[in-house]
Design a protein with these regions (language model features):
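Sec-dependent signal peptide recognition
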Residues: 18-24
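Short, Lys/Arg-enriched N-terminal segments with co-localized hydrophobic residues
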Residues: 2-14
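Short, low-complexity interaction segments enriched in Ser/Thr/Pro/Gly
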Residues: 13-16, 772
Length: 783
């Protein structure tokens, strides 16, 4: 087992200069002297093709274990070979296409961020009297004790809402009341946030195209002498806000990470967020620049194939040259920090590159980074850990963080039909606040649907996967689909002495020819919903991890896309109902199901409730209904103290007409509801309790088209009230009378990916807030 080496970085200190190699965009040399004329209409490169130039490289599989690189040269060589091979496969595919039209490493870098001028905010010192789960509902998290990032958060006294480009903070002096405290502009497109006491971390997507040309960040992200090409297309920004006074949030830190935000979790004051970076390479080309005359040739003309082959070979040579001129620092992600009006750039490699690792048999050009933030650290220090790999899926329990990824990228399968889909599993110990420690890797056959297909329970990792799901389109007989549940535990590899995940049990051949649509692990059970034409619910016993077994199965029409355990005896699910013939799916129908699993060997359905946002569901003008809760569990809000479920439901229609003068007019009519459902385990029934309606926020004289922003996005139960949140307003409804208690209309500022943004210096702690005057939160005396 290898030892990970910590590299210390000081974000405020001097950084060693890294020379960036400037490259122009390489083009194919289709010029006179380099080309042989075939006829007046088309030219092809005058190139002699080597006999083995298009040989397919045989892929070998060994282990998903994360292995260190011996030095920077080995890391650079491996990365460049992977990038080159991926581009080569894409070019080879272009040869085959007759109609083709061209056009982390693992390092534990403990980083202490420099203090801003006014220092950091202190940790909360008092316990809130309002308790989540008893007095109010929070985010619908997968695991107890693990908070998931979302764009709506509450501490029971305030509601925090990322609305468009703004952070909006509301006060809740008493349940049933609502006051606007502040509105703060956030750079980029804010997508999620994490809350702990008086610190709020807002995560936003910043497009490189939106960065103002006067911002020094634009110079850092651009390639010298290459117009219009950026190192990466997007940044993940962390805006750390001191919200001691909710009326005037102050910016404490600003960090920019190259790459896309995946997700974030908070456990005991420590935030761990995962990003995926994919660096643009100047001069790298994965398409063919076909000459204009090519398209004038007959479709079956063999000259077409010759042109594609020779252009492909020339492009491969050009790619090799482009990569040879790049330095290692050019293909690794960077971190940027704004400090006292100065932008500081941080590279993540050290002199030996001994911290960087990748799976033993699966190199890639992507970087999965785990950033660990300790909110109780006055200087907001963090670890930056990196793995070379594919896009990750993330799961977390209170003690473990799990990243799963496709073991091999798509291009590995080209010319290697015998390889089967597999998923790498990388585990990390997060039991100590502020630390994330790698504990081993494993692999299962098939692909993992989402975070609910993974669970850690009493030291046992459980995985649900479907094999043969992504049938390869070039194969005549791809392997049929089948699902499995696998159990793994930590162990030691006898040959390498490394910590690994060892498979100890499995159950196979679940629902042949079907794939998993939803999964949920609860204690020593697993619940699966598979689907092809009907919806089987499977109950799997995991009490003996060495011998998992199917206990029961129930087949019903339709499908469930999210499973919510109510108790040991009941499951509540949401999904779609069946088609008219009882088979397939009616995508316009949102359906709730209450399953009775008190006898796990014979599960049954207690009740089914179909939901519609309009009074007359047979009115063909309304052709569909939509609920975000059918695919996003955070929109599904079940409140156990009252046995109530809140589900957003919406639709719209387009109306047009001509007036008496022949003038054409049109309008959009919206229905935006939150349906409250009574759920009784005792009687095994469900019924409509009432509806919260936000339609009036969106139906106005201007007939504005709101895109997908007219939906009620989230809901919060507080005492005897429910708070419904949408882009144009927040309402408070009494659950007893279903009458509106109060409401606040909002102005939604549309997110814009490519709009330039000017960033003001935040070194002294600033905000662009408006709302109530500078005064404490109305509930501050209660803390």
């Amino acid at each position: 087992m290898y030892q990970l080496i910590d590299s210390e970085y000081s974000f405020g200190g001097a950084m060693k200069a890294e020379k960036v190699v400037a490259l122009g965009v390489l083009t194919l040399m289709l010029m006179s002297g380099c080309l042989g004329a075939v006829n007046p209409a088309v030219e092809i490169p005058n190139i002699e093709l080597p006999d083995d130039w298009n040989t397919t490289v045989a892929r070998t599989t060994s282990s998903p274990q994360l292995n260190q690189f011996s030095d920077c040269d080995e890391l650079e060589t491996a990365l460049k070979l992977s990038i080159e091979e991926e581009a080569r496969i894409q070019i080879m595919q272009a040869i085959e296409g007759q109609n083709y039209r061209g056009g982390g490493m693992w390092g534990e870098d403990t980083i202490a961020v420099a203090e801003s001028a006014d220092g950091g905010s202190s940790a909360p010192t008092a316990t809130l009297r309002r308790t989540e789960g008893t007095d109010f509902s929070g985010t619908n998290n997968q695991e107890q004790g693990v908070d998931e990032a979302d764009f709506v958060k509450t501490d029971g006294y305030n509601i925090y809402f990322l609305n468009g480009k703004n952070l909006v903070i509301f006060g809740v002096p008493e349940f049933g009341e609502l006051t606007l405290l502040s509105t703060t502009a956030i750079q980029g497109n804010p997508t999620a946030m994490m809350l702990d006491g008086d610190r709020l971390v807002v995560i936003s997507h910043v497009s490189t195209w939106s960065i103002d040309s006067n911002d020094p960040l634009a110079d850092e992200l651009g390639w010298e002498d290459v117009e219009g090409l950026w190192r990466t297309s997007s940044l993940t920004k962390f805006t750390v806000l001191d919200i001691t006074n909710r009326s005037t949030p102050e910016t404490a830190k600003e960090l920019y990470l190259e790459g896309d935000y995946m997700t974030a979790r908070e456990v005991n004051g420590t935030i761990r967020t995962v990003t995926h970076a994919w660096m643009n390479i100047p001069g790298l080309q994965n398409w063919l620049n076909l000459p204009a005359g090519y398209w004038d040739l007959d479709y079956e003309d063999p000259l077409r194939f010759e042109i594609r082959e020779k252009l492909a070979y020339q492009t491969i040579l050009d790619n090799q040259q482009a990569l040879s001129e790049l330095a290692l620092v050019d293909i690794l992600p960077k971190v940027y920090e704004r400090l006292n009006g100065v932008l500081i750039t941080h590279t993540l490699e050290d002199d030996a590159c001994a911290d960087f690792v990748a799976p033993a048999d699966g190199m890639n050009r992507g970087f999965n980074s785990i950033f660990t933030f300790d909110l109780n650290d006055e200087n907001f220090g963090f670890q930056a850990d990196h793995i070379v790999g594919n896009y990750p899926m993330v799961y977390a329990s209170e003690n473990s963080l799990v990243l799963t990824e496709n073991a091999w990228d798509w291009w590995w399968f080209w010319g290697n039909d015998n390889m089967t889909e597999a998923t790498n599993i990388h585990t990390f110990d997060i039991s100590n606040p502020g630390d994330t420690v790698y504990t081993g890797s494993g692999r299962v056959n098939g692909t993992v649907l989402n975070q609910f297909s993974v669970s850690e329970h009493l030291g046992v990792l459980r995985i649900a996967a479907t094999s043969g799901q992504w049938a390869r389109w070039w194969m005549e007989s791809p392997e049929p689909m089948s699902s499995s549940v696998v159990t793994l535990v930590s162990g030691v590899d006898a040959d390498t002495d490394q910590q690994v995940l060892v498979e100890v049990g499995r159950v196979d051949n679940i629902a042949p020819e079907e794939r998993i649509w939803s999964a949920r692990f609860d204690g020593d059970r697993c619940y699966l919903v598979t689907f092809r034409q009907t919806d089987p619910l499977w109950v799997i016993d995991l009490s003996d991890e060495t011998n998992p077994m199917i206990l029961g199965e129930l087949e019903i029409p339709g499908v469930s896309t999210y499973i919510h355990p109510l108790s040991r005896d009941h499951l509540l699910t949401i999904g779609m109902g069946p088609g008219i013939d009882g088979l397939g799916l009616d995508w316009s129908n949102t359906r709730l199901s209450l399953f009775n699993i008190s006898d796990p060997t014979s599960p049954s359905v207690d009740d089914v409730l179909s939901l519609t946002p309009v009074a007359n569901s047979n009115d063909t003008a309304w052709t569909w209904s939509y609920s975000e809760a059918s695919y996003e569990h955070k929109a599904f809000q079940y409140w156990a103290p009252k046995g109530l479920l809140a589900v957003p439901l919406s639709t719209y229609r387009y109306d047009s007409s001509y007036d008496q003068n022949g003038r054409y007019s049109y309008s959009y009519q919206y229905v935006s509801n939150l349906v409250i459902v009574n759920v009784s385990e005792e009687t095994g029934t469900m019924s409509i309790h009432g509806t919260v309606n936000h339609s009036t926020f969106y139906n106005n004289e201007e007939s504005t088209y709101f895109g997908g922003n007219y939906n009620i996005r989230r809901s919060i139960f507080m005492g005897d009230f429910i708070y419904a949140v949408s882009a144009q307003g927040v309402t408070v409804t009494n659950l007893t009378t279903m009458e509106e208690s109060t409401s606040l209309a909002l102005t939604y500022e549309e997110q814009c990916t490519f709009c330039p943004e000017i960033v003001e210096d935040s070194s002294e702690g600033s905000s662009s807030s408006e709302g109530s005057e500078d005064k404490p939160s109305p509930n501050e005396s209660e803390r």
